[in-house]
Amino acid sequence: MQITRPHNFETFIGQKNLISTLKAMIESSKKQNKVLNHILFYGMPGMGKTSLAGIIANETKNKIHFIQGSNLEKKSDLINILSVINENDIVFIDEIHSINKNIIEFLYSAMEDFVFDLIIGTESNAKALRMKIKPFTLIGATTKINEMAQPFKDRFGYIARFVSYNAEDMKQIIRNSIKLLNINLGEEHFDFVASYSRNTPRIVNHLLERINDFAIVKNAGIIDKKIIKKTFKSLDLYEYGLTKDHVEYLQLLRDGFDSKPVSLDTLSGVLIHPKEVLVNEIEPILLYLKLITKTSKGRMISSKGITYLLKEKLIW
């Protein structure tokens, strides 16, 4: 059995303030018989943004349309989607920052007034046409909110940041997931598994599935500390759930540049990773764990980062 997404607010773990606000918005829109305001979710990948959009659709009993931002390249792409929706439908655009920048402003009137302003014909024969669309709710999700234009962000009635999950949240997610997977993982292992998840629900669910795989194949279905460690070793995971990419980054700062500040451009060139990958995928957990620091001169490994490498026997 696969782990399924939560389907209502009660089964969604964490993000309490965010959910409290969403509940109030939904209840208010029902009482006023108004379309739900547009909502923008932002935060790290795997935190539950898509799941929560689905829950909003369930709670409002409205249809949801899932779209990838990168697939919206032309005005016609937007028209094709928004011209066929029903009143109060939800349009969820994942990675909304990746919509073609040339059509973003075309979306503004659709969000504010539920219309499209079109120009039909060319030059002297051009005519302005206003096309009405049915009231809808746009829910956007992004891992790169800084790439969104301020006027675009201003058109969302609620902008919500997904905060890091705490230890208790992660243990509850594990508790729920092992029931769905029908695996016998003792509570004494919850903290250890959670510590490798980088406090991310999607990651912990993937880890549980792989632990289950190894237990079935290597240990007659029995999950103990030994098989969990074997799983993590096979996945090339280190303490705190760091990957080889994280470790190579730390090693480069420590050994390649004698623990001196290094520019992002230099790191990108040596590690052969785009700067965006370093900033959005590798550095966040290292900064959160205080294994690195950012200075005006560049990135530096911290004393805690050096201690981490020594503890993991990654430097001598």
Curated annotation (Swiss-Prot):
Top enzyme class: hydrolase
Catalysed reactions, semicolon-separated: ATP + H2O = ADP + phosphate + H(+)
Protein name: Holliday junction branch migration complex subunit RuvB
Entries under Pfam families matching the protein: AAA_lid_4, RuvB_C, RuvB_N
UniProt entry keywords in alphabetical sequence: ATP-binding, Cytoplasm, DNA damage, DNA recombination, DNA repair, DNA-binding, Hydrolase, Nucleotide-binding
Protein's gene: ruvB
Region Large ATPase domain (RuvB-L), residue ranges: 1-165
Protein role: The RuvA-RuvB-RuvC complex processes Holliday junction (HJ) DNA during genetic recombination and DNA repair, while the RuvA-RuvB complex plays an important role in the rescue of blocked DNA replication forks via replication fork reversal (RFR). RuvA specifically binds to HJ cruciform DNA, conferring on it an open structure. The RuvB hexamer acts as an ATP-dependent pump, pulling dsDNA into and through the RuvAB complex. RuvB forms 2 homohexamers on either side of HJ DNA bound by 1 or 2 RuvA tetramers; 4 subunits per hexamer contact DNA at a time.
Biological processes annotated in GO: DNA recombination; DNA repair
Positions with a binding annotation for Mg(2+): T50
